[in-house]
A protein has these predicted regions:
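Short, contiguous strand/loop micro-motifs
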Residues: 25-26, 59, 82-83
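Charged helix-capping and loop-helix junction motifs
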Residues: 64-73
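Glycine-rich phosphate-binding active-site loops on the catalytic face of alpha/beta enzymes
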Residues: 11-21, 50-63, 96-129
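Internal catalytic-core helix/loop-beta-alpha segment
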Residues: 28-43, 47-60
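Residue-level marker of alpha-helix boundaries and capping positions
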Residues: 29, 66, 86-87
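Glycine/small-residue-rich loop that forms an oxyanion/phosphate-binding "nest" at active or ligand-binding sites
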Residues: 1-33
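A short alpha-helix capping/helix-coil boundary motif
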Residues: 18-19, 73-76
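Catalytic cores of alpha/beta
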Residues: 1-7, 33-45, 75-81, 85-86, ...
């Protein structure tokens, strides 16, 4: 990755672990996770982790939430969900206060933004939330 002007690398469940070389210490590593166990496993090796699906998908029919609110609260209480963990899956503007209260460091919004009647206004509202 150091041969290209990338700011980082995003890993998925099928990706091998990525070990930074000496020249790559400033790059950001993020990873998609689909279980609390994966968050625990990769947290010390990544700058950011995306946990999904938190809510029922907005854009993928039949793709439901994988975690109960109780499970997420317990993970937050144990320090597993924190500022390094971003919520993904079914996230909309209305979810932001709940995600913040559960300890997520942020959220990735896809379907709600894609389906917004006024995406620019919706994005601005998200950024101000």
């Amino acid at each position: 990755i150091s041969r290209f002007p990338f700011g980082g690398v995003h890993l998925i469940s099928r990706s091998p672990e990525y070990h930074k070389t000496t020249a790559e210490q400033d790059i950001t590593i993020s990873r998609s996770c689909h279980s609390i166990a994966e968050i625990i496993q990769y947290k010390s090796k990544c700058n950011y982790l995306f946990l999904s699906p938190i809510y029922d998908s907005i854009s993928k029919e039949g793709y439901g939430a994988a975690f109960s609110r109780i499970d997420l609260k317990q993970a937050a209480d144990k320090g597993i969900i924190d500022s390094k963990v971003l919520a993904l899956g079914g996230v909309s503007l209305e979810c932001i206060p709940q995600l913040r209260s559960m300890g997520f460091g942020g959220a990735a919004v896809l379907g709600a933004l894609w389906q917004a009647k006024e995406p620019t206004r919706y994005l601005k509202a998200l950024m101000e939330a």
